[in-house]
């Protein structure tokens, strides 16, 4: 008589065992936290690239469109320096500065004459800066 052979694996034989034993080694090289971080970063990166391509396809581009840039981080890990000028550029920093000054005092910032630069250099040459014992600057004239 034939024995009744079961196709199902024994109860101790779990699905997780199959996943761990049969998958390539590279799948488990990174931790789940790293994979989730990369996944989120990739979504942000692709959203930025989509925005950039759609912007380049349009025939007429207004300046306000550049103010609504999606968040874009260059790397999935935190870089050593978080520079806002990479995202916004220098022109946007100047725009923010002009708005903070309420457009009235902008010309005071832009007008720098040669004599003002020479006066500042002369001041810097006359003041020698040395370190005091507490880590601060000790100015002697």
Swiss-Prot record:
Q: Which GO terms describe its cellular component?
A: mitochondrion
Q: Where found, per UniProt? A: Mitochondrion
Keyword terms of this UniProt record: Mitochondrion
Give the miscellaneous note. A stretch of 270 kb of the mitochondrial genome is duplicated within the centromere of chromosome 2 resulting in the duplication of the gene. The expression of this duplicated gene (At2g07708) is demonstrated.
Q: Can you name this protein? A: Uncharacterized mitochondrial protein AtMg00500
Species name for this entry? Arabidopsis thaliana (Mouse-ear cress)
For this protein's source organism, the top of the classification is: Eukaryota, Viridiplantae, Streptophyta, Embryophyta, Tracheophyta
């Amino acid at each position: 008589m034939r024995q009744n052979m079961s196709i199902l694996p024994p109860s101790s034989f779990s699905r997780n065992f199959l996943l761990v034993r049969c998958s390539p080694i590279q799948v488990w090289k990174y931790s789940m936290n790293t994979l989730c971080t990369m996944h989120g970063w990739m979504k942000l990166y692709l959203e930025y690239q989509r925005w950039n391509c759609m912007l380049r396809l349009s025939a007429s581009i207004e300046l306000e469109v550049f103010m609504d840039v999606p968040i874009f981080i260059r790397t999935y890990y935190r870089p050593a320096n978080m520079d806002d000028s990479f995202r916004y550029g220098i022109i946007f920093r100047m725009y923010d500065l002009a708005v903070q000054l309420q457009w009235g005092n902008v010309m005071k910032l832009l007008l720098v004459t040669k004599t003002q630069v020479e006066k500042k250099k002369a001041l810097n040459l006359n003041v020698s800066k040395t370190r005091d014992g507490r880590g601060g600057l000790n100015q002697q004239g």
